[in-house]
């Protein structure tokens, strides 16, 4: 009896973890779950109850799902910063699970730069709060006419967490998603953090 109840709990946790793995149709999933508010509340519960598994690759895009819904982007920013601080350290066990050919390290680096490709095969990124003040990415001249992408962030105070505004190529971006072309051809991605 004990092993059955333990197995049922493990199945329940696994089912919750895989529920949100529909990266190609987040809006359709939200409709099936009762709409935006219900979707956001259920997703937040995964984080609040400690059910999010940072070592389980299908889960790693979950913090960005909030940003698909206007007004909920702050949750992405909060959760990615919390997860970086909790699970990615300079200790010997400073990466959750194993690195699976660099998957977890790449997750951390993308987040530290302020963007993440949350849907495989879709050339778009969700923006989140960068850790670094400045990052320069040198672009391959075989593929891009631009030489580099500069990412800069300025904080109104040292512990600022939330994005106040974003500019790409000097123009204000009024959303928290950016296409690959916008990113690599914009030259400069600027975050103002409040």
Predicted features and spans:
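A conserved active-site cap/scaffold subdomain adjacent to cofactor or substrate pockets
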Residues: 16-33
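Non-catalytic C-terminal accessory modules of carbohydrate-active enzymes
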Residues: 32-36, 50-54, 63-194
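Membrane-embedded transmembrane-helix bundle of lipid-linked glycan/lipid transferases
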Residues: 45-48, 59
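Short alpha-helical scaffolding segments that buttress acidic/His motifs in well-ordered protein cores
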Residues: 26, 43-44, 80-83
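A post-motif C-terminal structural segment
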Residues: 7-10, 21, 120-121
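Aromatic- and carboxylate-enriched substrate-binding clefts and catalytic-loop regions
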Residues: 7-10, 52-58
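Single conserved hydrophobic/aromatic residue that forms the stacking wall/gate
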Residues: 1-9, 13
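Interdomain hinge/lid region at the active-site interface
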Residues: 39
């Amino acid at each position: 009896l004990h092993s059955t109840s333990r197995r049922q709990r493990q199945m329940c946790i696994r089912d919750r973890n895989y529920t949100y793995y529909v990266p190609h149709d987040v809006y359709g999933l939200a409709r099936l779950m009762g709409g935006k508010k219900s979707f956001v509340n259920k997703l937040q519960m995964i984080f609040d109850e400690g059910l999010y598994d940072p070592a389980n690759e299908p889960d790693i895009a979950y913090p960005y799902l909030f940003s698909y819904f206007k007004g909920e982007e702050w949750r992405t920013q909060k959760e990615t910063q919390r997860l970086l601080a909790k699970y990615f350290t300079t200790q010997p066990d400073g990466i959750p699970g194993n690195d699976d050919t660099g998957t977890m390290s790449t997750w951390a680096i993308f987040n530290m730069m302020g963007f993440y490709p949350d849907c495989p095969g879709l050339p778009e990124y969700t923006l989140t709060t960068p850790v670094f003040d400045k990052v320069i990415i040198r672009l391959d001249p075989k593929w891009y006419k631009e030489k580099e992408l500069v990412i800069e962030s300025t904080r109104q105070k040292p512990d600022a967490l939330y994005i106040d505004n974003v500019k790409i190529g000097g123009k204000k971006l009024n959303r928290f998603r950016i296409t690959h072309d916008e990113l690599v051809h914009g030259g400069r991605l600027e975050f103002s953090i409040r």
